[in-house]
């Protein structure tokens, strides 16, 4: 009895750590856009307003995923949703190296935003599953914010170093994509907790229909 309990705690700790690192990895790119925009302006001779599309595209993707894809975690499960988001993000990140046009980059940023949004629907649902109390849920979310903050520092720092050495900003996305690939492998190896499919709404609706038929 003791060994399975220890194994469960160890597995849960791995899940939490992976989730924290995933949020940190996403922050590395989303919070580096401010440094990339001046490079985009120089390369494509754009106005600041036009170059701002780099920021809008990512956020629009996140918003669209949150509004229209929020049910994926309940429909397909936490792990598949998280892995799908990570895979989509990794693919978009690697494609930056192949791009040479501003519209192409903007589309990739929108796709990466959708990927982040999909990931977040799965990750936030997972956090709700593994938290045993409101206090624990708050603690996990605070740690997530902390790791996101670390990524917000590390990403721009790496990008600044790349630019100082004359290396294209695209390689930050390659780095993020590589980290993402490692996280995908790790996520497929860890045992995620089982989640019950949401049926309460259906049951409630069926009861209401029966009640209307039999007043």
Please identify what each model-predicted range represents.
Residues 14-42, 46-48, 120, 124:
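Extracytoplasmic
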Residues 102-104, 143-191:
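Helix-loop-helix hairpin linking two adjacent transmembrane segments in secondary transporters
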Residues 108-146:
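Cytoplasmic helix-loop-helix junction between adjacent transmembrane helices
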Residues 18-19, 103-109:
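Short hydrophobic/alpha-helical segments at membrane-entry points of transmembrane helices
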Residues 2-10, 192-215:
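Juxtamembrane intracellular "pre-TM" segments in multi-pass secondary transporters
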Residues 31, 58-67, 153:
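Residue-level signature of mid-helix packing/kink "hotspots" within the transmembrane helices
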Residues 64-103:
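Conserved MFS/SLC helix-loop-helix module at the cytosolic interface between two early adjacent transmembrane helices
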């Amino acid at each position: 009895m003791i060994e399975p309990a220890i194994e469960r705690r160890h597995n849960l700790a791995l899940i939490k750590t992976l989730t924290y690192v995933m949020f940190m990895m996403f922050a590395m790119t989303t919070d580096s856009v401010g440094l990339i925009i001046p490079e985009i302006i120089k390369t494509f001779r754009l106005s600041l307003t036009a170059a701002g599309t780099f920021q809008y595209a990512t956020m629009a993707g996140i918003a669209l995923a949150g509004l229209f894809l929020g049910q994926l975690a309940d429909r397909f499960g936490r792990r598949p949703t998280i892995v799908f988001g990570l895979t989509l993000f990794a693919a978009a990140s690697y494609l930056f190296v192949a791009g040479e046009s501003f519209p192409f980059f903007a589309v990739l940023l929108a796709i990466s935003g959708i990927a982040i949004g999909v990931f977040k629907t799965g990750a936030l649902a997972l956090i709700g599953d593994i938290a045993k109390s409101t206090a624990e849920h708050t603690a996990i979310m605070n740690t997530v914010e902390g790791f996101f903050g670390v990524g917000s520092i590390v990403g721009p720092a790496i990008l600044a170093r790349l630019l100082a050495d004359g290396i294209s900003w695209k390689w930050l996305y390659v780095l993020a994509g590589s980290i993402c690939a490692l996280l995908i492998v790790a996520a497929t190896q860890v045992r995620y907790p089982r989640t019950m499919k949401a049926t309460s709404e259906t049951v409630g609706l069926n009861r209401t229909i029966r009640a209307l038929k039999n007043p």
